Amino acid sequence: MASETHNVKKRNFCNKIEDHFIDLPRKKISNFTNKNMKEVKKSPKQLAAYINRTVGQTVKSPDKLRKVIYRRKKVHHPFPNPCYRKKQSPGSGGCDMANKENELACAGHLPEKLHHDSRTYLVNSSDSGSSQTESPSSKYSGFFSEVSQDHETMAQVLFSRNMRLNVALTFWRKRSISELVAYLLRIEDLGVVVDCLPVLTNCLQEEKQYISLGCCVDLLPLVKSLLKSKFEEYVIVGLNWLQAVIKRWWSELSSKTEIINDGNIQILKQQLSGLWEQENHLTLVPGYTGNIAKDVDAYLLQLH
């Protein structure tokens, strides 16, 4: 009897414990979990049928699946520039965010040297292009047009001077000194003569062979006009040329022999003497001009 009573108490205690656990609040199970638990409780035959049906739906039309995969590979071409991406459709939000992060990361890790070199190349290319295509006349065309609005006469003089100097420069580059002298005599422009004569003077001082005695004789009328000018710069250019001619041909000019092979020496001596009789007053001019005139006068006095 005692044992039966003990067993009854034990059974009642266990029932209370079970009731207690049953009454405890349980964690809410989702519908998906309940559905899976129900499917697990299915019979083996039902489970096998379910598996076959599910697999059949997945494997259904494998050609279509391969076609989709092929199209996806065809769209995503590898680009040379990893930071350039074709804009994707709005439906792929996650992929867009990932691609945008990759683009920002790639842009952040680009070498600074490459960026500097490209910028330098652009700057250099732009500088070289402007230097090759733009001439000085086209570069300052706006400035010239603005200045010439109220100075049309001066603009014409400068244009004419520039054109004549270009012609003289063409003769000089060809080393056609006789043609250059003939051109200077024909235009009778003392401004162009003043620009060209110092070059010929340097050639005489360096004893260049392409400056002949005949060219020097032909230039004497222009030099006489320079010595009569009211501009001291013109006078200095003429005196420097006279000094160079006398020193270059001094051995022939100072020769006492009556037989002279070149007749231009006699012509040059006579013209120099007649020219200096009219312009010997230049020795009274103070400064650099008077010093050159005194040196020329000292040479010409020995010829009398």
Swiss-Prot record:
> Could you tell me which InterPro entries the record lists for this protein?
Katanin_C-terminal, KATNBL1
Coiled-coil region:
none
Quote one Gene Ontology molecular function term.
Answer: microtubule binding
Task: Note whether Disulfide bond occurs among the keywords.
Answer: no
Functionally, this protein is described as follows:
Regulates microtubule-severing activity of KATNAL1 in a concentration-dependent manner in vitro.
Describe, as the record does, how this protein assembles with itself and its partners. Interacts with KATNA1 and KATNAL1; these interactions are competed by KATNB1 which has a higher affinity for them.
Q: What is this protein called?
A: KATNB1-like protein 1
Supply the source organism for this entry: Homo sapiens
Top-level taxonomy: Eukaryota, Metazoa, Chordata, Craniata, Vertebrata
